Amino acid sequence: MKRKVSEFSYGFVLTHELVNAYGYFRTDAPHGSRGGRKKGAEDGAGAAPRGYPLFLQFKASEYMKRRNAGESKLVGLPYFRFALHRKTQSNQHQLLIELEKKGYAVFYATPKIHEAVNLNSAFFDRQVVASSLFVNPGEIGELPDNRPHRVVFSGRSEDVYVCSKPQRLGGVIHGAVFAEAVRRAVAEKEAQSLDDEFFNRLAGDMVSLISPNRRIFDELSGGKVEMSASTFANYLAKTLFDCELLIVPS
């Protein structure tokens, strides 16, 4: 079935809610706001802000309601699904797994909403997070072959599967408990001081997964003279990983 909610519109409303309702920090802000300041700089409270990086890749979900829908036996009708890129199309999924292995919080985020009018209602009622599903790429694991693979789920059940060969996924996060689940996960890590040194290190980690050649990082860095370190990290997250980079406050 044709998608009625685009990744662009969903990504905007989800990010807006995480920032304005949950207090997450943006990393594409102008100089001097929240993320990205000189090492040792302090905020108005007298201490440099601290937090944890969060990578979100937005996935538009297909709404399946016909009786011949292939995965209906798993979760019933209607249901949602989103596709993972084949290996020959993109190494995107593997890159996200490698990013997760470096200790960063990484999720696919997808809506349990298929009509634009429902997305609008969720946006104004601040229910976008609650109407979403979050899946760790590492939970899905490496794709075993070049066949089409999809994540299948329903708005009425907590069961989530990865197909083509159906396998139930554990550890997925349904939106209503997302903020608390992320808070528990990052509580096990040391909060990072959100200064230029941190964002430059984060940028280096991202580039190293694309190419171990330091020259690539230097070339990318050459054009960021008028860009804060946090904005540059956000730029790399978007261009190299197709992700939104946010900061979960400590």
Q: Model-predicted segments: where are they?
A:
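Glycine-centered small-residue hotspots that permit tight backbone geometry or close packing
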Residues: 40-42, 213
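Extended, basic/helix-rich recognition subdomains
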Residues: 123-250
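Active-site metal-binding core of divalent-cation-utilizing nuclease and nuclease-like domains
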Residues: 28-40, 48-49
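Conserved catalytic cores of phosphodiester-cleaving nucleases, focusing on short active-site segments
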Residues: 44-45, 54-62
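Catalytic cores of nucleic-acid endonucleases
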Residues: 60-124
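Short, surface-exposed beta-edge/turn micro-motifs
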Residues: 42, 52, 103-107
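Acidic-basic catalytic patches of nuclease active cores, encompassing PD-(D/E)XK
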Residues: 1-33, 99-102
